[in-house]
């Protein structure tokens, strides 16, 4: 039981580190648009049917929102991004 718990915890920690690393990379590239880029990648994964990728990039977007004081986060822009990606996937 303890071994399974330890394995789960290590996997969870590795995933959180990957999310933090990807968020940091997006912020370093362009802090203002990092949230939108992560949302676009989440939308692409969603419309490809990649649930794991969607969850990852949605988590990255949340991490960008958490750590960046200047990242833009307009919901109308996010909706436009989702609509664009939806149209591309058809």
Q: What are the functions of these language-model segments?
A:
Residues 55-69:
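TPR/TPR-like (Sel1-like) alpha-helical repeat modules
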Residues 46-49:
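Hydrophobic/aromatic side-chain positions at a characteristic register within alpha-helices
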Residues 1-39, 44, 65-90:
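Long, non-catalytic architectural segments outside compact domain cores
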């Amino acid at each position: 039981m303890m071994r399974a718990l330890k394995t789960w915890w290590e996997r969870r920690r590795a995933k959180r580190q990957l999310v933090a690393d990807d968020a940091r990379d997006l912020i370093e590239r362009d802090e203002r648009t990092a949230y939108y880029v992560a949302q676009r990648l989440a939308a692409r994964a969603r419309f490809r049917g990649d649930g794991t990728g969607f969850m990852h990039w949605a988590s990255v977007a949340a991490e960008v929102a958490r750590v960046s004081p200047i990242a833009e986060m307009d919901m109308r822009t996010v909706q436009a991004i989702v609509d664009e990606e939806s149209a591309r996937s058809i």
